[in-house]
């Protein structure tokens, strides 16, 4: 007596074919948001099942709104969400960089290099990059810090709000910054009130 198949109307991929399909899924996701990258990035018009629309060029918003079933694509979205939770920026760059790394890894696999060897190479590259960052870092003034904050705010609201948000954000961070410049963002509490303007926002110590 033969056993009934558990998964009907499905196909199974193994080996190099499965690896290629996984990389293709990651690359497709990266390509979907590539045009949103940078200060001149394009907006995406998102429409949900109920017909509601959202215009944004925020990478993590686009990815989390998309209905993706592929497990590797979901991993890429989770990576972007983690980047957003920790750094609050760089979500699009994270996905694009991961996609390019996978694409380059695939080219090396086609040349006969084992995936574990490629993974070791990426880990060594990470160590080298961290060393380079330590060597080229420099102190920044308030003007440069403000510019960095404004850049991260691009596409997240009207440009007229950026000056105010950048100023109060820097003030809040400087209030909680430790002696070694470490910052515990849990010490910053946001309290919002209905009505008024963004320009009315203020920073208070000790609440």
Place the predicted regions along the sequence by residue:
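Extended amphipathic alpha-helical scaffolds
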Residues: 1-55, 60, 126-207
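Glycine/serine-rich anion-binding loops at beta->alpha junctions
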Residues: 13, 83-93
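Short glycine/serine- and small hydrophobic-enriched flexible loop segments
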Residues: 31, 78-82, 100-107
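Glycine-rich oxoanion-binding loops at beta->alpha junctions
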Residues: 50-84
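Elongated alpha-helical scaffolds
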Residues: 74-77, 89-103
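Short, solvent-exposed positions on alpha-helices
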Residues: 92-93, 116-120, 163
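Hydrophobic or amphipathic alpha-helical targeting/insertion segments
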Residues: 102-143
């Amino acid at each position: 007596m033969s056993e009934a198949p558990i998964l009907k109307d499905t196909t199974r991929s193994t080996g190099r074919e499965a690896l290629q399909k996984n990389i293709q899924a990651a690359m497709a996701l990266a390509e979907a948001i590539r045009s949103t990258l940078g200060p001149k990035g394009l907006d995406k018009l998102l429409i949900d099942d109920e017909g509601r629309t959202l215009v944004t060029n925020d990478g993590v918003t686009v990815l989390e709104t998309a209905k993706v079933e592929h497990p590797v694509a979901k991993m890429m979205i989770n990576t972007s969400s983690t980047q957003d939770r920790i750094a609050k920026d760089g979500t699009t760059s994270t996905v694009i960089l991961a996609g390019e790394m996978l694409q380059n890894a695939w080219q090396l696999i086609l040349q006969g290099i084992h995936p574990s060897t490629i993974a070791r190479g990426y880990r060594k590259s990470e160590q080298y990059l961290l060393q380079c960052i330590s060597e080229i870092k420099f102190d920044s003034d308030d003007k440069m810090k403000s510019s960095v904050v404004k850049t991260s705010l691009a596409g997240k609201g009207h440009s007229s709000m950026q000056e105010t948000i950048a100023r109060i954000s820097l003030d809040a961070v400087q209030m909680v910054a430790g002696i070694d410049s470490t910052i515990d963002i849990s010490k910053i509490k946001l309290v919002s009130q209905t009505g008024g303007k963004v320009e009315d926002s203020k920073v208070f110590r000790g609440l």
